Curated annotation (Swiss-Prot):
Gene that encodes it: atpE
Gene3D superfamilies: F1F0 ATP synthase subunit C (1.20.20.10)
Lineage, highest ranks first: Bacteria, Pseudomonadati, Pseudomonadota, Alphaproteobacteria, Rickettsiales
Keyword Cell cycle tagged: no
Domain of life: Bacteria
Name of the protein this chain belongs to: ATP synthase subunit c
Length: 74
């Protein structure tokens, strides 16, 4: 195999990182909705923590995307 094909295989494998970020964000907000349904008075605190967690999970997906773009264009 030549280097170009290996770059595209590596880029395809980077999609796993983006898939993991999507699963993480969906789990965070699923848990948020069920927690708010159980205890509506804690909504503000739960939302703040969920948004921080979603931001961190989404950052991992963005890092994966940046690395994939570096692999393609380098």
């Amino acid at each position: 195999m030549d280097m170009v094909s290996l770059k595209f295989i590596g880029t395809g494998l980077m999609a796993i990182g983006m898939y993991g970020a999507a699963l993480g964000v969906s789990n965070i907000f699923s848990s948020l909705l069920s927690s708010i349904a159980r205890n509506p008075s804690a909504t503000e605190n739960l939302q703040r923590m969920a948004l921080i967690g979603a931001g961190l999970a989404e950052a991992m997906g963005l890092f994966s995307f940046v690395i994939a773009m570096l692999l393609i264009f380098s």
